Amino acid sequence: MCGIVGYIGKRDVAPLLLEGLQRLEYRGYDSAGIVITSPKSTGLKMVKAKGRVRDLEARVPKRFAGTTGIAHTRWATHGAPSDENAHPHLSADNKVAIVHNGIIDNASELRAKLVADGVVFLSETDTEVLTHLIARSQAETLEEKVRQTLKLIEGTYGIAVMHADFADRIVVARNGSPVVLGIGEKEMFVASDVAALVAHTRQVVTLDDGEMATLKADDFRTYTTEGSTTTATPTTVEWEAESYDMGGHDTYMHKEISEQPEAVDRVLRGRIDDRFSTVHLGGLNLDAREARGIRRVKILGCGTSYHAGLIGAGLIESLARIPADAEPASEFRYRNPVVDPDTLYVAVSQSGETYDVLAAVQELKRKGARVLGVVNVVGSAIAREADGGTYVHAGPEVCVVSTKCFTNTVVAFALLALHLGRIRDLSVSDGKRIIEGLRKLPGQISEILETEDEIKKLAAEYADAKSMMFIGRVRGYPVALEASLKLKEISYIHAEAYPASELKHGPLALIEPALPTVAIVPNDDLLEKNRAALEEIKARSGRILAVAHREQEKADHTIVVPKNEDELDPILMGIPLQLLAYHMALALGRDIDKPRNLAKSVTVE
């Protein structure tokens, strides 16, 4: 993986592809490459570079003309970052070029057979295997060459293929890794993400797993990997190209943190029903009888989405009185879980394409489970695979680390919990209480954002820490987990999160002045328990930064946040910790939008 972009038409292709790669930079990558041709060309022309897209652009010669091309940003899975391992990959006769997201599971076996037949490999990647297999196919058409090759491989892929002898087309295919077609006026685009397309077209077709497409300048057709024709109905992308710009901010992360009041307002808009103190979530495909029959809720996600799911599980238990828990999707799918028909499964993913979550959804569907999706991207794989769901309406999130999407996902869970609760036993007065709390959120988030200068000063005091501990109790624990993840993702400071109740069971051994502790201390029924934890840390000379609703005398510093309903407090307590991580990383000179070794959308195992 990580980013694919392609074009066929009449325009000069290299600038279009480089622009597309720049719009995909947020996904994370370590190298980039481009290959082009045209109907009048005698072959393929390729340039690759380890590093950033700007490094690739610097290598592209001035005379590099063509009207058809594919390009790629790579995030290493097989082989270290290098010019040789960067995509595209060319066949030995320089006729076949391919870019690929995904992992070929049987690449080693296929590679050994090709080497035995005399094929010389120039890279360590699994992708190069595909290139040689396509080149060696005796099929008469490029489509059939690709189909024959796909029958030989095991694994996941999103690919785009060019051939010097078929310069009038690009062939693409999908299995487990996103491929989106962009439909223009006598021109066609392909990408792994609509971000690369929206500057040129809003009409898109998202391929399903097991589907292929042939793109020509003036038309396209879709079909299965078995050769059967499929029907492709274009949809309109709602996001504008400007949504992917920084809008005057120094980083995408800062922009996205600052957008949270508007983002939360957007996820609430049109969903609240004051008459009955409930909410309407039209895409759930879950009627009242089915909702009353739910005996358990299991939430699946990865990383930040998993943390949002932990808060969501607490909201569902509290408001709907249904037993609920959350689990990393990457663990769930490998432990042969018992799938209960009375359990509602909820899959959470910002992109809607996260491989481990998607694989868990597909396994659940095979076993007859009911699955809802909570995603940000309309038309994504999880949205299509699930029985129903809700969109979080955060808008495009470009920074690799998630901020506004995390917040909106938790708000979406609050809406889901309220919806289920009012169908079951939640009172009108409690429904009204939660609705009033939800309506306060945008204004309260704005209040927190206005304290950024104070948080920036605190960040400077803690930026020299080599390690940090985050603690919280019950609702506060997932906030601690997410804050810990944010800090390690962008500052590279080691951080751990523990339930505050577990301090005596091991973590107290770590407490010393050099290890700051960030404590989540809401003004709820556990306030005194949390204060006792601060006492234990202070007794061992630990430094404490508290996030609380009022100053904490045992803390060295306190970030004070507005009080909402107890159930909704985690949403607000996470916001200042996003800013803390941001400014600590900034003080350390980190590449905040593109942290090392990370990708925005993890579409491989």
Language model: regions and residue ranges:
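A SIS-like phosphosugar-recognition module
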Residues: D165-F166, S177, V204-G248, Y252-E256, ...
